[in-house]
Amino acid sequence: GMASKAGAIAGKIAKVALKAL
């Protein structure tokens, strides 16, 4: 549902942020 979708988006953002560091 909405929660899992938000979690997936947050995970993608976290991965991108880690790569940017």
From Swiss-Prot:
Keywords of this entry: Amidation, Amphibian defense peptide, Antimicrobial, Secreted
Disulfide bonds: none
Post-translational modification Leucine amide, affected residues: L21
GO terms for cellular component: extracellular region
Tissue distribution of the protein: Expressed by the skin glands.
Keyword Protein transport: no
Location(s) in or outside the cell: Secreted
GO biological process: defense response
Main location: secreted
Entry keyword annotation includes Oxidoreductase: no
Family according to the record: Belongs to the gastrin/cholecystokinin family. Magainin subfamily.
Function: Antimicrobial peptide.
Full protein name: Peptide PGLa-R2
